[in-house]
Amino acid sequence: MGTCTGHADLVELKDGRWYMVFLGIRNDEEGTSNMGRETHLVPVAWEPSTVRWEEVSKGNWQPVEYLWPVASPETGKVERYTSLPFPENPQYFNDAFTDNFDAEELGHEWNFRRVPLPGTYSLSAFKGFLRLHLKPETFKLLGRYSLMGIRQKESDFDYSAKMHFEPNKENEEAGISIFQQDDNYVNFTVVKKGKGVNLKLTVKEREKELEVLKEEIIDKYQGEIIFKLSAKNNTYQYLYSLDGGNTFRLFAETQSNIVLCKGYIGTYVGIYATSNGKPTKEYADFDWVSYKGYPRY
């Protein structure tokens, strides 16, 4: 199930067994996956192979054999799961993450695209919340903007975020994002439009123009919303709740390959805020984010 494999290291255990650790991409969708290049493990067997023939005496030719490492000798391919070398140590799948923003500093799970702009976020302005300040900057090549995320770890997952946001000026916008590159992302956001507030789904596919896939007024919006992105069977569902998570409404649906990795870099899910080119002092407060991955078997 692995593609783009390479950069292998061979390891011999104390009992004489051999394994190979290398980079590769899961073959989850269209020969690739949204997680990019990851670390894989396979068993190795050493098998003899004739590399040349030598004439040891006149007319007497003998094969010269070397031992070569054969990766995954039983099946000849990278399997989705390989038993760990040490059966007494069960494999731990770290496929869940929740941040209630109660700590004084962000955990190491969080990443930014490049060094964040000064004053991008605060964990102290509103205790128990992450305050993400709206910046005029938006997604652009080699740009810096109010965007932060955690790694997507499985092709099937649920990602949710609870946001408090009361925009005052036209086009002030905040919400969640799933992003692969500066030119390949999906934003699911609340945005100020006229006297009302809209819910908007924006899609930027690679080598295509930016598209507002859906936008509509939220009649009962009271400044609080829970976004949910549910990924199952190569499909993304974009849902939201206005009643604290008691009920969710399906807003839109897309195929997951709109942010499909075509290189070695994986996808992030995260939060995003922008004033779309206008200076502002507004912000969005995030109460929590939650991610749960579901391994494929």
Language model features with spans:
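Carbohydrate-active catalytic/glycan-binding domains of CAZyme proteins
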Residues: M1-Y297
